[in-house]
């Protein structure tokens, strides 16, 4: 663990806090948890708890909240745990300070709305040849913070780097598998948020458990078709960062994407649902995911139905009826 003595987690949310605690527990001597909110930093420093985002979980003694982005200059490892649409701005702020050999683990899931770039592409666009890895998989911050068994995937094009980075976050209850299939891991993490909105809508509309299971299975087929168009490994999509994350996100009220869809299914307006739930990554990813699918000639009817609802081209009931009216076909057609 001596290799990762100084770690910086960019993002003071629940997931950033949980990962910062893991890094401290894994042996890092100094873990800086950065957020731009000075009042939030003062609260965490005074109480030893991130009461706003992860209440009831003590901060490790090696963890120090800060608003100073200059801490990245001395870091051995950076965890980027900010919303996907904010990643570029944060990386631009640290670009001149970040030492070139310092690895960056991207812990956000999505596609940049304005450019259609995946998170690793955003990092490359801003930072050039900085070593980058991606962390994704079925995980809720509270589960990890409370020591509940969780398994995730860490991907880097450099397989040796991926294997080495595992030790920075490993814990008896937090198991990391590594891979070189960065794009496959990113696709799973981005697409599942959109599909979870569909499952939430179905649950909110009280369509039943059978409909929910069908949406997961057919959503996974869409995920696989999309991934194949990008040349990713099917085993990655069938693993933790693909199917695993899809199942978790599509079946739990802890998921903001699922909860957002559930609210829409209950008749809540899009604006009210967003205001009540907070950041919904799938809301921002949906349009660009479908744009990429259309550009690649990939059929994604569930994702397209969600897009139509979010763009207010269709109501919830019309979108459901449209999916149910699709012609019957062989189950594995196009899979």
Swiss-Prot record:
<comment type="function">
    <text>Catalyzes the reduction of the glycolytic intermediate dihydroxyacetone phosphate (DHAP) to sn-glycerol 3-phosphate (G3P), the key precursor for phospholipid synthesis.</text>
</comment>
<dbReference type="GO" id="GO:0051287">
    <property type="term" value="F:NAD binding"/>
</dbReference>
<keyword id="KW-0963">Cytoplasm</keyword>
<dbReference type="InterPro" id="IPR036291">
    <property type="entry name" value="NAD(P)-bd_dom_sf"/>
</dbReference>
<dbReference type="Pfam" id="PF07479">
    <property type="entry name" value="NAD_Gly3P_dh_C"/>
</dbReference>
<feature type="binding site">
    <location>
        <position position="139"/>
    </location>
    <ligand>
        <name>sn-glycerol 3-phosphate</name>
    </ligand>
</feature>
<keyword id="KW-0444">Lipid biosynthesis</keyword>
<feature type="binding site">
    <location>
        <position position="192"/>
    </location>
    <ligand>
        <name>sn-glycerol 3-phosphate</name>
    </ligand>
</feature>
<dbReference type="InterPro" id="IPR006168">
    <property type="entry name" value="G3P_DH_NAD-dep"/>
</dbReference>
<feature type="binding site">
    <location>
        <position position="15"/>
    </location>
    <ligand>
        <name>NADPH</name>
    </ligand>
</feature>
<dbReference type="InterPro" id="IPR013328">
    <property type="entry name" value="6PGD_dom2"/>
</dbReference>
<dbReference type="InterPro" id="IPR011128">
    <property type="entry name" value="G3P_DH_NAD-dep_N"/>
</dbReference>
<keyword id="KW-0521">NADP</keyword>
<feature type="binding site">
    <location>
        <position position="36"/>
    </location>
    <ligand>
        <name>NADPH</name>
    </ligand>
</feature>
<feature type="binding site">
    <location>
        <position position="137"/>
    </location>
    <ligand>
        <name>sn-glycerol 3-phosphate</name>
    </ligand>
</feature>
<keyword id="KW-0594">Phospholipid biosynthesis</keyword>
<keyword id="KW-0520">NAD</keyword>
<comment type="similarity">
    <text>Belongs to the NAD-dependent glycerol-3-phosphate dehydrogenase family.</text>
</comment>
<dbReference type="GO" id="GO:0005829">
    <property type="term" value="C:cytosol"/>
</dbReference>
<dbReference type="GO" id="GO:0046168">
    <property type="term" value="P:glycerol-3-phosphate catabolic process"/>
</dbReference>
<dbReference type="GO" id="GO:0005975">
    <property type="term" value="P:carbohydrate metabolic process"/>
</dbReference>
<feature type="active site" description="Proton acceptor">
    <location>
        <position position="192"/>
    </location>
</feature>
<dbReference type="InterPro" id="IPR008927">
    <property type="entry name" value="6-PGluconate_DH-like_C_sf"/>
</dbReference>
<feature type="binding site">
    <location>
        <position position="109"/>
    </location>
    <ligand>
        <name>NADPH</name>
    </ligand>
</feature>
<dbReference type="GO" id="GO:0047952">
    <property type="term" value="F:glycerol-3-phosphate dehydrogenase [NAD(P)+] activity"/>
</dbReference>
<dbReference type="InterPro" id="IPR006109">
    <property type="entry name" value="G3P_DH_NAD-dep_C"/>
</dbReference>
<dbReference type="Pfam" id="PF01210">
    <property type="entry name" value="NAD_Gly3P_dh_N"/>
</dbReference>
<feature type="binding site">
    <location>
        <position position="109"/>
    </location>
    <ligand>
        <name>sn-glycerol 3-phosphate</name>
    </ligand>
</feature>
<keyword id="KW-0560">Oxidoreductase</keyword>
<dbReference type="GO" id="GO:0008654">
    <property type="term" value="P:phospholipid biosynthetic process"/>
</dbReference>
<feature type="binding site">
    <location>
        <position position="245"/>
    </location>
    <ligand>
        <name>sn-glycerol 3-phosphate</name>
    </ligand>
</feature>
<feature type="binding site">
    <location>
        <position position="256"/>
    </location>
    <ligand>
        <name>NADPH</name>
    </ligand>
</feature>
<protein>
    <recommendedName>
        <fullName>Glycerol-3-phosphate dehydrogenase [NAD(P)+]</fullName>
        <ecNumber>1.1.1.94</ecNumber>
    </recommendedName>
</protein>
<keyword id="KW-1208">Phospholipid metabolism</keyword>
<feature type="binding site">
    <location>
        <position position="141"/>
    </location>
    <ligand>
        <name>NADPH</name>
    </ligand>
</feature>
<dbReference type="GO" id="GO:0046167">
    <property type="term" value="P:glycerol-3-phosphate biosynthetic process"/>
</dbReference>
<feature type="binding site">
    <location>
        <position position="257"/>
    </location>
    <ligand>
        <name>sn-glycerol 3-phosphate</name>
    </ligand>
</feature>
<comment type="pathway">
    <text>Membrane lipid metabolism; glycerophospholipid metabolism.</text>
</comment>
<keyword id="KW-0547">Nucleotide-binding</keyword>
<dbReference type="GO" id="GO:0006650">
    <property type="term" value="P:glycerophospholipid metabolic process"/>
</dbReference>
<feature type="binding site">
    <location>
        <position position="256"/>
    </location>
    <ligand>
        <name>sn-glycerol 3-phosphate</name>
    </ligand>
</feature>
<feature type="binding site">
    <location>
        <position position="279"/>
    </location>
    <ligand>
        <name>NADPH</name>
    </ligand>
</feature>
């Amino acid at each position: 663990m001596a290799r990762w003595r100084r770690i910086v987690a960019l993002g003071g949310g629940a997931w950033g806090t949980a990962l910062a605690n893991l890094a401290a527990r894994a042996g890092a001597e100094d873990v800086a948890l950065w957020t731009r909110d000075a009042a939030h930093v003062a609260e965490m420093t005074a109480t030893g708890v991130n009461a706003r985002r992860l209440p009831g979980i003590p901060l490790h003694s090696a963890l120090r909240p800060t608003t100073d982005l200059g801490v990245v200059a001395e870091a051995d490892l950076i965890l980027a745990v900010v919303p996907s649409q904010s990643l570029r701005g944060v990386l631009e702020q640290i670009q001149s300070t970040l030492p070139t050999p310092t690895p960056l683990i991207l812990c956000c899931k999505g596609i940049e709305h304005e450019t259609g770039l995946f998170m690793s592409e955003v990092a490359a666009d801003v930072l050039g040849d900085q070593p980058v890895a991606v962390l994704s998989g079925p995980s809720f911050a509270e589960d990890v913070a409370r020591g509940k068994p969780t398994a995730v995937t860490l991907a880097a094009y450099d397989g040796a780097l991926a294997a080495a980075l595992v030790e920075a976050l490993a814990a008896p209850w937090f198991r990391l598998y590594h891979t070189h299939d960065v794009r496959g891991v990113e696709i799973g993490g981005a697409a599942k948020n959109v599909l979870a909105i569909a499952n939430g809508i179905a649950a909110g509309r009280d369509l039943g458990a059978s409909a929910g299971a069908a949406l997961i299975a057919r959503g996974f087929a869409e995920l696989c078709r999309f991934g194949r168009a990008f040349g990713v490994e099917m085993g990655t999509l069938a693993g933790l960062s693909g199917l695993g994350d899809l199942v978790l996100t599509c079946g739990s009220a802890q998921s903001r994407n699922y909860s957002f869809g559930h609210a829409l299914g209950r008749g809540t307006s899009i604006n009210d649902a967003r205001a009540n739930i907070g950041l919904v990554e799938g809301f921002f990813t949906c349009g660009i995911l479908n744009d990429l699918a259309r550009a690649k000639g990939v059929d994604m009817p569930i994702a397209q139905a969600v897009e139509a609802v979010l763009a207010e081209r269709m109501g919830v009931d019309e979108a459901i009826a449209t999916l149910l009216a699709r012609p019957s076909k062989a189950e594995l057609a196009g899979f």
